[in-house]
């Protein structure tokens, strides 16, 4: 199961998930000047970040919107980035947040679990219900793939829907999490975690322990660290024995060179930030 590969990557390299949400204005001007087209520039920047952080991260999350916004040349960079990650045997999360049913969802599954855009995990939006998850299950069962489904997110607007009362003292996010956790038990790996994970933001620490205890077999993709205000202490509460999830950081890693005095090598700065993040979370877990 892909869940086992993720668990073992975390054990080896730590919980950091490097977010390749690469905006053109994140790229240093000196580096930009070397390229005549945006596709090559984006891919070359990503490649430098990947090489610098591969051995200090569990996986990479590639947010497709940053590439779609540039049209075909952006999608070419997206494709090349995924291909390079596969070449490096890195685990890939395609952050696509799809949420449809039936034939449409089958095509989304085919598009992102096969071919040019193949990834190990994708993100999904469950708003349409559990049948929006069904078309991905054959890939989870037979093709070593996985999904991270939105459960309780880190944005302020999460209060608008995710926190609505759903009866029996539960909120909407509780119901979503419980349904996914139950489904996920059909796809458990040898380490006790499922290939059906949840996106759980780290900016609401007061619910952390309860969620970790209830969603006992669900690996968490944890956004909100760094730029959104989440701390190592916040993150530690969502993990179990230092595992059971990965912690995404995008801007804080990609833009580390802007915050460091020795900022000539943006990739080396990204590596230093990833190591600092990994070590801070490890220290918080031990406290």
UniProtKB/Swiss-Prot annotation:
One of its GO terms (molecular function) is orotidine-5'-phosphate decarboxylase activity. Belongs to the OMP decarboxylase family. Type 2 subfamily. The lineage of its organism: Bacteria, Bacillati, Bacillota, Clostridia, Eubacteriales. It comes from the Bacteria. It catalyses: orotidine 5'-phosphate + H(+) = UMP + CO2. Pathway: Pyrimidine metabolism; UMP biosynthesis via de novo pathway; UMP from orotate: step 2/2. It comes from Clostridium perfringens (strain SM101 / Type A). This is Orotidine 5'-phosphate decarboxylase. One of its GO terms (biological process) is 'de novo' UMP biosynthetic process. Its EC number is 4.1.1.23. HAMAP family: OMPdecase_type2. The active site is at 97 (proton donor). PROSITE patterns: OMPDECASE. Keywords: Decarboxylase, Lyase, Pyrimidine biosynthesis. Pfam families: OMPdecase. The gene is pyrF.
């Amino acid at each position: 199961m892909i869940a086992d590969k993720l668990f073992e990557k975390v054990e080896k390299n730590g919980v950091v998930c490097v977010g390749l949400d690469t905006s053109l204005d994140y790229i240093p001007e000196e580096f930009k000047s070397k390229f005549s087209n945006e596709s090559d520039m984006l891919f070359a920047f990503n490649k430098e970040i990947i090489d610098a952080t591969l051995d200090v991260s569990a996986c990479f999350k590639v947010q497709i919107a940053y590439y779609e916004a540039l049209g075909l040349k952006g999608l070419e960079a997206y494709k090349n980035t995924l291909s390079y990650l596969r070449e490096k045997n890195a685990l890939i999360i395609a952050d696509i947040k799809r949420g449809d049913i039936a034939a449409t969802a089958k095509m989304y599954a085919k598009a992102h679990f096969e071919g040019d855009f193949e990834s190990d995990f994708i993100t999904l939006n469950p708003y349409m219900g559990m049948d929006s998850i069904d078309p991905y299950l054959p890939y989870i069962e037979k093709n070593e793939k996985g999904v991270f489904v939105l459960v309780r997110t880190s944005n302020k607007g999460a209060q608008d829907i995710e926190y609505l009362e759903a009866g029996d003292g539960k909120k909407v996010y509780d119901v979503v999490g419980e349904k996914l956790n139950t489904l996920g038990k059909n796809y458990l790996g040898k380490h006790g975690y499922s290939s059906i994970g949840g996106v759980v933001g780290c900016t609401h620490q007061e619910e952390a322990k309860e969620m970790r205890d209830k969603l006992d077999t669900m690996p968490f993709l944890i956004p909100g660290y760094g730029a959104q205000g989440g701390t190592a202490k916040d993150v530690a509460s969502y993990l179990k024995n230092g595992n059971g999830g990965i912690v995404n950081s995008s801007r804080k890693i990609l833009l580390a060179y802007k915050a460091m005095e020795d900022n000539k090598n943006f990739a080396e700065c990204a590596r230093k930030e990833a190591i600092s993040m990994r070590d801070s979370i490890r220290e918080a877990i031990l406290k």
